[in-house]
């Protein structure tokens, strides 16, 4: 059985969404299952449903834009986070931010203003940037067939709280090329941890924390996909701090080794000197 655009629109409505939300969607097209028209139909449904609000999809380029390949072109640089964002960024009416490694594409009346100024950021999720502002606008995050390991907003929480050992000490000199060809020099510190190169893989620990009472996330039905929709921390960052700290901090006696996402030291990041 293949799903249709009407099926997808109904599923979004059944989630309790109105279409007026500011919503950031992390997705896996494969997880949705067969859809008549494929990825284009999924995007048609999302753009129609959220036309009154603001639809945001990450169009990250961190896998390819770096010191060795420093030029990000907002019009042509392909994203590295899936087929839906890659097709979405090329659609008429969609605006893409100028962040060289963690750009976001948006569709809606507020897209231009919401995404403006990202060429001025110097970290992936700089406080005051697009990810951080989700909490200020009462935004939502929809995870379609992916886990919290792909929830970039958690990086934003860490940056707001100044969690140490999350960013490289030295910045890369990058360039963001705008739609008119003008270039902006950006000095960007990338995500980096010497003992744990795959920081986000431990973000799945937040699933249990955020589904505890009172729940911050809830499971939703969207065809064959596994979905979760957490509020973008509508509370102050300080409210999110103890949850993030307790969920991500390994036990002091823990000595795991080997494999992706493993902790190779008892404590591979230290929660101290953070700012509220």
Regions found by a protein language model. Give the residues of each.
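N- or domain-start disorder-to-order transition segments that initiate the globular core
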Residues: 1-7
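N-terminal active-site beta-alpha-beta segment that forms phosphate/nucleotide-binding
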Residues: 18-68
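Internal, conserved structured core segments that host functional sites
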Residues: 66-156
